[in-house]
């Protein structure tokens, strides 16, 4: 959620979901949907029938019930992937999965729209994990929020437009800093190879200083390894760097989000 948090601090959207907070608070999908729906309703009372919600790409993995479901699906498809792939009918494919899931997770899976069910069971990435960038979490939330609003006594206008910026957010034109930083990383990596060192990752620090004062170094890849389940087996992988909920960026966001939710406070960083 690093990019999502930074975008929130720079633009002040009405709602921003931070995956790490969802996991820490053990929030359910329904609780997230209720929060969004309540904000939409509160803004509607102020005759502000518009708003912006920022959702991180990997959110679905951080919702505890969905995380359990994805882990179970990864295990199931690692063991019975061939039998699943041989089924051509979509409904039969979903029944195949539901019949093999624990009852608690089967009910979660069955409650999802079929488009999301299919996306959760599509081809895995090379590590055997669900490809979260291909799961249309934003469309799932729109459908669930729409259903939640219909159950409210007030008649609330809700017509959502979704946009996926998973790649656009990482492919903007590089700044001078980006160019200097990447050049330095590459130059340093070549120096590490030239010194005959392997299994190290190049790093540059002291980045707040001018480029000529940056410091180069190398860190062993093993120092960053973590054991995770991949293809139904334990594998060493580099652990993800997560948003620190006690860090200053998140704390600044947390202090202001209730205001941004109700009072339109959009800003343009450009």
Question: Which role fits each region the language model picked out?
Answer:
Residues 1-158:
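Accessory alpha-helical/coil subdomains and C-terminal extensions
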Residues 154, 162-270:
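Phosphate-moiety recognition in structured ligand-binding domains
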């Amino acid at each position: 959620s690093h990019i999502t948090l930074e975008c929130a601090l720079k633009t002040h959207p009405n709602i921003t979901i931070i995956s790490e907070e969802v996991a820490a608070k053990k929030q359910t999908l329904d609780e997230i949907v209720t929060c969004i729906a309540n904000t939409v309703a509160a803004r509607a009372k102020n005759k502000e029938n518009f708003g912006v919600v920022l959702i991180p790409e990997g959110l679905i993995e951080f919702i505890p019930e969905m995380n359990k479901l994805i882990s179970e699906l990864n295990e199931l498809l690692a063991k019975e992937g061939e039998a699943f792939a041989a089924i051509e009918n979509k409904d039969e494919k979903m029944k195949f999965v539901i019949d093999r899931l624990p009852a608690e997770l089967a009910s979660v899976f069955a409650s999802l729209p079929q488009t999301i069910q299919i996306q959760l069971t599509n081809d895995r990435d090379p590590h055997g994990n669900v490809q979260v960038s291909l799961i249309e979490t934003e469309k799932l939330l729109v459908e669930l929020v729409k259903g939640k609003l219909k159950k409210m006594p007030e008649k609330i206008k809700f017509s959502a437009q979704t946009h996926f910026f998973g790649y656009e957010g990482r492919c903007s034109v590089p700044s001078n800093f980006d160019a200097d930083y990447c050049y330095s990383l590459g130059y340093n990596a070549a120096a590490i190879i030239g010194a005959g060192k392997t299994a190290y990752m190049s790093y540059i620090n002291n980045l707040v200083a001018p480029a000529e004062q940056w410091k180069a170094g190398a860190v062993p890849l093993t120092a960053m390894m973590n054991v995770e389940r991949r293809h139904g087996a334990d594998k060493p992988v580099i652990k993800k760097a997560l948003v620190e909920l006690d860090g200053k960026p998140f704390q600044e966001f947390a202090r202001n989000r209730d205001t941004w939710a109700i009072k339109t406070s959009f800003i343009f960083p450009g």
